[in-house]
Amino acid sequence: MECQRCPASARNPATVESRKEKFCDECFIKFVSTKQRKQMMKDEYFRNLFKVIYPFEKEGSVSKILLPLSLSDSGSLVMLDIVHDLLLEQTKQHNNRTGFTVDVLTVFTEENVSVIKERMESLINEKMSQLNKISNIFNVHFIDVNEFFNNASEVSTFIIDNENFEIFSKSKSVDDSNILTLKEILGKYCLNNSSRSDLISIIKTQLIKHFAYENGYNAIMWGHSMTKLSEVIISLVVKGKGSQIATFLDSESFDTLNNKPCKYKNLYPMKDLLSVEIESFLQIRNLAQFLINVEETNVKPNCLIARKSLPSLGQQKLVKNMTINEITNKYFQDIQNDYSNIISTVLRTADKLTQPKSSMAKPSQCQICQSKIYTNPSNWLNRITVTSPYPVETTEEKYLFKQWQDSKLGQSHTHYVELLNEIKQGASNSLDVEDGDVKLCYGCLILLNTSIKDKNLVWPKVDTMDITANATNNNKELSQILDQFEINSDGEE
């Protein structure tokens, strides 16, 4: 088989087959890179961000771009590789000048800090140090996921009244004796893997957006492929967060955070690429070595002709043990080689959605995920749900009720009622208007009601957070890597 894009006089052997077309390695790399660069130049705002603007002394001629890099995600790594090549081209064409600088942000946990250190050392040495010898084009930042809790001066305990779905909260100040950690939140409050996955995703997204807001970036480049975006869209619908889809995909408007306007826009440069194409690019460019899950990456579906590989049956989870995100991921991974039109249809349909009309008296944002709230979910659930129990009457019913009260489930319910009454009392005595008017989006309300222990969750107050306080230098060993390769940032000192 020969490449269909090479000149007829010198066709190379085909190594990739995607979208019913055959490519050699070189043509496929060009195909993927062109798809990403086209998105980076999608409108005037982004064109002005990424192109080299003359004169160089003009204020704002060099844009600041934030690139969240996950070393367990192929998309963000491939995106970084293509951006690196674009910057290299600009330095050659414009006398060592570039139109933008890139700040790479990695959010890490205690469990993976050592392997991230190892992989980032290799990545910095191979992909960033060359350009930084010319100019300070790449900056690298690290944030411990626990900074989401450490940098908030106040936390709120949210609880749902299961009689009418009304939400109450109680705020308290944070000091060294009561700082929360991710491990504590996931272990103490989450009842299943789906709730853990949702909270981790919310925390990481909020950390990245706060970092962008506080440091004045012009854009955040997310490494979501077309497949990944479709997965997120379906997951949002399943979780009761379908109203967030239009905002999630919006790359035309400036973002908002805690009802405050931001100076950056969100961009998805990989949205025209399937995840199998990204995995193939990863293998061709030998980028898998930088990921922390190399073995898992090597068995992901791709569109390489000679190196296609699929997970063995022994590696697959049972559906009942999978999170909502994992189920949607499996579905789209299974169909994307043969039915990629389904994936593109999901994304095209979602792109046409607009934000719902709000029925709220004033603009509100969810206290947990920070999404916009368009209608009060508590009122709607209360109208359609019967929550009052049937009274206990017979001797047998009283006996069974007593058994239930003495069980772990009954004791948990007793603890929930006590906590609810305590928080209700605190809310009624509070002079803080915000505490008396707590709002959660429908998805987070359902999460709290069904997947969180005792229907209560302790969560930082977003407007009291300062993410940059400990960014980059919260791990000395990681900072030493940056020093070694002269990849520095202003927030590092």
Swiss-Prot record:
Record keywords: Cytoplasm, Phosphoprotein, tRNA processing
GO cellular component: cytosol
Full protein name: Cytoplasmic tRNA 2-thiolation protein 2
Gene3D superfamilies: HUPs
GO BP, one annotated term: tRNA thio-modification
Pathways per UniProt: tRNA modification; 5-methoxycarbonylmethyl-2-thiouridine-tRNA biosynthesis
Recorded family membership: Belongs to the CTU2/NCS2 family.
Gene behind this protein: NCS2
Cellular localisation: Cytoplasm
